Amino acid sequence: MSMVRSFFDGLTNVLSGAGTSVDKRVHARYGLNIVDQHQVEASYRTSWLARKIVDMPAHDMTREWRDWKADGELIGKIEAEEKRLCLRERVTQAIVLGRLGGGAIYLGIKGDDPSQPLAVEHIRPGQLSYIAVFSRWQLTIGQEVSDPEDALFGGPDYFQITSIANKVGVRIHPSRMVIFKGAHVMRGIGSQWEDAFWGDPIYQAVGDAIRNADSAQNSFASLIDEATYDVIGIPGLMERLSQPGGDAQLSKRLDAARQGKSNHRAIILDSGEGGKDAETWVTRQVTWAGMPELMAAFLQTVAGASDIPYTRLLGTSATGMSATGEGDKNDYLSSIATKQETMLRPNMVRIDAVMLRSAGIKDELWFDWSPLFEMGEKERAALDKLKADTAKVWGDSGLVPIDALAKGAQNLLTEDGTYPGLDEELKKAEAIVAPDADVAPVVANPDDLGLTSEAKPKPLLKIVGDAAPRPLYVNRPLLNAAEFIAWAKAQGFKTTTPADDLHVTILYSKTPVDWMKMGTDGWGSDAKGNLDVAPGGARIVEPLGDKGAVVLLFTSSSLSWRHEEMVRNGASHDFDEYQSHVTISYDASDVDLSKVEPYRGVLKFGPEVFTEIVEDWKPTGGEA
């Protein structure tokens, strides 16, 4: 019976020898050369490239730190506790040690036996005394816990400190240690349990690439000393050397040539007889063609092996047409964000469970990692505008209570540092004594406002003080009426609205509403309830309505938000849309409005005045 053999053309090719015994590649094998503690330390301390590969991701993981989802007071307490413990610095150090082969953070609990399990639920305020960082080589670990039902499964049953004076031999329960591991090690034939627990140093997989790059750089540096060299030709050199005293004569000749070059900046050579048998001296230069590209190739290999972009690792700009490096940077930061979630967050959750209780805070709070992407001024401004627009949309929708939304927006502005000092100013604003709960937010008498006589609102509307549902008209009197009228006169208005009637309308609601539900103004008012509209911005003078009014239109987000807040609380607005304005005059037929320059100064408004609507109201005579 004949034997039939099948040959497959692919990875194995008997004609070309690929994949067969004559192919050199089939004899290649990976060897496991364990990088020991001394090599790790030597690499980290002597190679700038090795150090950056370890430090850079660790610092990037903690660079922007985290944002707590809590109110400003709680966030302040948490940040104070973090600073006391130097938490951010300790975590960064532990990540570095983890990348060097393993690190750990010890939670130092005051008055506790470190060898006993940590009862997190029994932590009292102030009990977390300190946190300490150890490398794997400062700790001895016990036996592996192999029971899958044990909470310590896969880890040691104890740790022992081996490098602290007066504490040698102290055993620590694993619940008091937070482990920062190196690269994952697969449990196999060639791996020890301790190595599998701590993980590999980063250098175990990247070491060859780093050594090749360092070697290429050192070799290139050595060649610099030989950048130029001299080629000297001496006729009959070998014959002279074979004669007695030939060596001395050659040395003497070369010394004379060097001395002439040094003293006279000239080389004296024997030109021979008729140019025959003449000495020669030629300076040549080493060609560096391809050397920079070769070194760059080694460094690119290191960048790929370490998962750090070439431009980030070396601090260089991207090369190539239209290259910005943004794609590489975004990919890198995305990988850092992944490490934060999968590697760092579980450890932070364990630390926070103890730290928050020690700070007297419930451990139900949670956090997000702060964005890693660094934005320019334009990008930041665009993002801030987007956040503001989003807050406005949620406020307009009525799905989120306005007070809760305002508090969240204030926390956001405080945390991202958009407005320095905002936190203190908000505390001052909150410290202002609010009116009693049983007092309606209604001004019963204009004299109580403390306004000047010309700024008091004209008593054309009936002022009331009870809280029964009724139509509502809300306005703010213009305090700097004299300045405003002087501007109007200068623009050609013969008569203007009387000073005591100049105001801005906030709400005109024919729908009866509970005035108590309108709340108190918190949109930009100062301690006295006054509101200033800053100079400039969009301002227009044009007719408005069917009663001959000419008004100054202006924009104010504080007035708009306050109007929308009242509408959300049940009021109506019986006009097409809300537009803040001050009525200049009801008699301006002889004024060419196209030539009027709008009022650009500050508009100072007094506190809100709540009144009922007067249905048959008509404009009165103007101020001459």
Curated annotation (Swiss-Prot):
3',3'-cUAMP binds at Y106, W617. One of its GO terms (molecular function) is hydrolase activity. It catalyses: 3',3'-cUAMP + H2O = U[3'-5']pAp[3'] + H(+); 3',3',3'-c-tri-AMP + H2O = A[3'-5']pA[3'-5']pAp[3'] + H(+); 3',3',3'-cAAG + H2O = G[3'-5']pA[3'-5']pAp[3'] + H(+); 3',3',3'-cAAG + H2O = A[3'-5']pG[3'-5']pAp[3'] + H(+). The active site is at H503, T505, H581, T583. It comes from the Bacteria. Keywords: Hydrolase. It holds the Pfam family Acb1. NCBIfam families: phge_rel_HI1409. Belongs to the anti-CBASS protein Acb1 family. Counteracts or regulates the endogenous CBASS antiviral defense system. Phosphodiesterase that enables metal-independent hydrolysis of the host cyclic di- and trinucleotide CBASS signals such as 3'3'-cGAMP, 3'3'cUA, and 3'3'3'-cAAA. This is Anti-CBASS protein Acb1.
